[in-house]
Amino acid sequence: RSRADRRRAKEEPRTEKRPLGPELEVVETQVFRGPNYWSYDPAIRLLVDLGSLEDWPSNTIPGFVDGLLEMLPGIPEHSCSLGRRGGFGERLKEGTWLGHVAEHIALELQRESGAHVYRGKTRSAGEPGRYNVIYGYWEERVGLAAGDLAVRLVNQLVEPAKDFDFLVELERLILLAERRAFGPSTQAIVDEAASRDIPWIRLNEASLVQLGWGKYQQRVRATMTSKTSALAVDIAGDKDVTRRLLASAGLPVPRGELVLNEDDAVRAATAIGFPVVTKPLDGN
């Protein structure tokens, strides 16, 4: 929509008291693990559809801004496009679109969990009500979880649901970030690689990390490097890591999933499709 349309949406009086419902939804998700179309830094892109919320900027929804500031008191301090501290708080009060709000929530949630991420942007996807929401991340799974929670929080502020407890959801995100955090040795290596502009990616749920690309790549786990055969032996002994690494290289591997209990095993088998084979993670 044009700038004039946007201005009218912010300023014109409303005949309806509230939006039709919490209609913000994620249509597509992409993870960029290096420089990409949107950013030099790793980023997540959510293609979101606002539905009828396209006609409801933040300043037109009763209680939306106050509720958001109560749940995330640090979010109005974001600089946003105004380039100064508190800029996003001003944008919220003058009226901004809910995809843009979700972007800043995703960043703030990650900062609440201990990550230092600041960059994001929201751009029209070329269709009415659809936007590309791009935001930086430090740990991939935490970044994806933050985006999911951001969308749910926006919908909660539009129309509260009884079964949504934001503090419980935030605590789950923080616990996920703590579980996914590297140990001090691996973190020190990753930080040094980042300071030298050496790309790195996490290869498993633990501390297996690839530094560099192509023929220059090296792998480390904690302080053990791929210069020794011990690391290869450990990887080969872990069926899940081996399967994931082979699949990421484009080699054919059977579908599989790591499970820890009977209920998860039944769910995974149903998703994969019978017949299935069960094997211990490490051993034969």
Report residues per predicted region.
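Long, compositionally biased, glycine/small-hydrophobic-enriched stretches that function as flexible linkers
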Residues: R6, E12-E171, L176-E178
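Active-site nucleotide/adenylate-binding loops and adjacent lid/helix of ATP-dependent enzymes
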Residues: E16-K17, Q30, P62, Q218-N284
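Short aromatic/hydrophobic-glycine micro-motifs
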Residues: G74-C80, A115, D197-P199, L251, ...
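Hydrophobic alpha-helical hairpins/lids featuring a short glycine-rich hinge
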Residues: R179-F182, A194
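Domain-scale recognition of functional cores that engage charged ligands
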Residues: G183-I189, E262-A265
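Structured, non-catalytic alpha/beta "coupling" segments that mediate domain-domain communication
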Residues: I189-L208
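Extracytoplasmic/secretory soluble proteins
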Residues: A206-G212, A230
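Glycine-rich loop at the start of a catalytic domain that most often binds anionic cofactors/ligands
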Residues: G212-Q218
